[in-house]
Amino acid sequence: MSLLENNIRKICKDWKVNSVAADLHCHTKMSDGSASIDEVVLMAKKLGLKTIAVTDHDTFAGATRACVYGRRQGIEVIHGAEISCIDSARGRKVHILCYLCQNPDRLEGVFKRTKERRQRAAALMLQKVMRQYPITPDMVSRRAQGSTNIYKQHIMHALLDAGYTNEIFGDLFRSLFHPREGSAYASVEYPEVTEIVPKIHEAGGLAVLAHPAVYDSYDVMEELLPLGLDGVEVWHPRNHPDDPERLSGFCREHGLIMTGGTDFHGLYTKKPNPLGTCTTGDDQVELMKKRCEKYRKQTPRADKQ
């Protein structure tokens, strides 16, 4: 047994989840998660999860690598990404989960623009933090190693290493990065959500609205229906008690796919949410694949155009 597998065994202990369940919302070190791609796949295997989706922010790189490693470990990895958007009419963030994209290259332009904007914001935030605390770019880069970008969590981890906090999310995080009051906050310009859903379909992917309760996305959920919204993330750790019933009712009324996911970030989370906390049933995973197959027939491959 490798050292990595032994460490994962210790983490997982005896906790098991339903072997037919799928956790369709997982982040890795490729974006703002603390666990590597291999670690996430091995955790899923030890927990008895049959299927996971790797959905790093604004990149398919994590999912592509996870699919390869998942096959070696006997874990089905659904290719995905979580796309950061804005609902400018209401001034709110919106996240769209893209699954099973047939032509991922068609979304690379969107990802590249977001990456560049996020890099500019991260550089500005880091400069502001370094004026207040004696951390260095190398300390932050070490924590961001393997990621497509520097995220606020990486800066906080450097501050934790330096002894200025004992938690990633807490009073110090709020004082630095609160959108209105944070002394080091810098905003990122994101694409309009009404533009992203059609782009996902043009690329042959499924568009699922992520965690509506987190960003109060209920109004935009209705507006995305005419654009062909495929599904809604019904089960999420940050739901309010009545959210699953409300969201599942909406999905049944409009014939939408119902997904569930932990929004796994490892250490980088406000409350402990181990992999498999929220899951998707086998029936919905099969529905996703059937709908994707329909899109596959409708969407010409980029290499055949």
PLM regions and their residue ranges:
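An N-terminally biased module of ancient metal coordination in phosphate/nucleic-acid-related enzymes
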Residues: 1-93, 176-181, 185, 191-210, ...
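Extended substrate/RNA-proximal surfaces in nucleic-acid metabolism proteins
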Residues: 2, 6-13, 71-219, 282-303
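A short acidic, helix-capping loop that chelates divalent metal ions and anchors anionic groups
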Residues: 106, 269-271
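Conserved, well-ordered active-site substructure
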Residues: 273-283
